[in-house]
Amino acid sequence: MDLGIRGRVALVTGAARSLGKADALALAAEGCRIAILDLNAEGAEETAKEIATGGGTARGYGCDIREGVDVGRVVTAVERDLGPVDICVNNAGFIYTVAQLKDMKDEDWALNLAVNLTGTYLITKAVFPGMRERRWGRIVVMASIAGLMGGFGQTAYATTKLGVIGFAKSVALEGARYNVTCNAIAPGIIAPNASLSPLFERMVKRVAMQREGQPEDVANAIAFLCSERAGYITGAVLPITGGMDLFTF
């Protein structure tokens, strides 16, 4: 199925590895020109090279999405190198340390907010005006099932993920009349995170399908939401959980 986005410029944050990399590869397969942003500049360049080796067009950029000046610098470079940004996938996120509220360190709370929420805001703010002016844009933010359900020991992480859902819905309202959509993805347990700790192993047992998801499960949904075929979908929250959010006996 042709998604109708060949030649579009797609910016993907946190795309040096894992889920973000899968997002970038899926969009590249649809013919998008890809800007790979990551705090790990070398990893971003490696992902870009992999796309180029497969016949696509991509550039890698080191970027700290917590810093507005750095975001502005990189977005300017992307538009110089590849063209105006049509698609923005806010994948970058902080892999939290599980801690109950009574034990949480203030710096962990601040880091969750800075990466998961402020970073999403800064990147989106940088590309949104151009999308609005050109009357076409697709924005996806990475939430989590934790943002919808909460989680024991996940106060900081879940708070930021619910926050980006509210952000996505508000941006969707602002962009609607300009053909700029904004949607949120709420993944459940996605490999390789499921292998990080015994906590994830226990959580997989709550999944109705009794298995973890793969990065491609999320990336394929994101590619669709970024396409011409999803032009009437905005302000939505799409759980990709294998039924983790369902009540099972």
Report residues per predicted region.
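Active-site helix of classical SDR
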Residues: 124, 160, 168
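Substrate-binding pocket helix/loop in short-chain dehydrogenase/reductase
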Residues: 99-101, 105-113, 203
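Short C-terminal tail/terminal secondary-structure segment
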Residues: 2, 95-98, 149, 223, ...
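Alpha-helical segment proximal to the catalytic Tyr-Lys
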Residues: 129, 173-174, 231
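Residue(s) in the substrate-gating loop at a strand-loop-helix junction
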Residues: 144
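Short, small/polar-rich loop/turn modules that mediate ligand/substrate recognition or access, typified
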Residues: 176, 181, 233-235
